[in-house]
Amino acid sequence: MHTQKSNFQTMKYFFYILMIAILGWFCFMQLFGANEQNYNNPSKSIIYSGSFYWNKEDGTKQKIDIPGTYEVKPGHTMVLTTTLPKDYDETSFAIRSSLQDIQFYVGNSLRTQYSTKDTRMAGKNSASRYIFCPTTYKDAGKTLRIELTTYTSNYSGIVNEVYCGNKAEIWQNIYNTYGISTFIAFFILFTGITSILFGIALKHVYHTTFDMGYFFDMEYFGWCMVMGSVWMLGESKIRQILVPNASALAALCFVMIMLSPLPILFYADNIQNGKHQKLYQNIGYVVILNFIVSSILYLTKVKDYIETLPVAQLLLVFVFILIFIHLMQYIRKINK
């Protein structure tokens, strides 16, 4: 019996070593192996290489570099034009909107337009996303015009990279560039939800709220992870293919930043046994008040979340610094 148990234990160790070796091999191949994605990549660049001109309101033209940022007043339309080459035969143009309404014209014909004015429930601007304009070889030699309009100074005058090629190839390039961060966000979201459920289950099983004598509370840590992952998904460049309503996810991104100090305060209060509870409670009231005021301004279309975001960022930084100081004091005290 002892020999059988020893052999089974040896098998377990072999399994652990084997799995670590397989994981190591996989990581080695990804870091140092051949990049097989290149075999499917287009042979030519999908970045549009033609010249763009900014047609200003005073009638003058200025050749501009793309991507770039230029001085345009909020609410004013920035008009960009380029002449398609004589041998043009691509099927799509694309540009990323940064909280901008976008219109594509080929010749004098409106080919594509994007605006959430009639579909969004609140806010002043359209959510950022990639806009595709279909083209054909018949458009060779014609003038392509792009009109950009935003109603906030944060993104007024911003011109993002312009892509030209097959729509699938453009999406592949975008996915290869930004896909990994989206996968990481989903992983953190799954881990955060698991932590919340695990923390709630522990409280239910042991009939305690973990308020005394516990250094780690799974639930609040899970909420921090969930809110962080939702922020990452809201910032994802490919969010328009993740959800049907990208505007809601974009707004949720800012909401998470505004409310994220709360679970951090709850966690810090728990591990310090309520030592600074009154202070944390007052800070929590300020966080909630900022959320309510910002939401009212957003719903009434007075200011977008992006315009009130600096206040939330300052609160978050203040909470981080305060909690860090208190935790250092707490750790120093318990180590004495």
Q: Where is each model-derived feature located?
A:
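Surface-exposed coil/turn segments at beta-strand junctions on protein surfaces, enriched
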Residues: 73, 86-88, 124-126, 137-139
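Extended carbohydrate-recognition surfaces in non-catalytic/accessory domains of CAZymes
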Residues: 3-86
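Extended low-complexity, serine/threonine- and proline-enriched intrinsically disordered segments
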Residues: 43-56, 100-110, 162
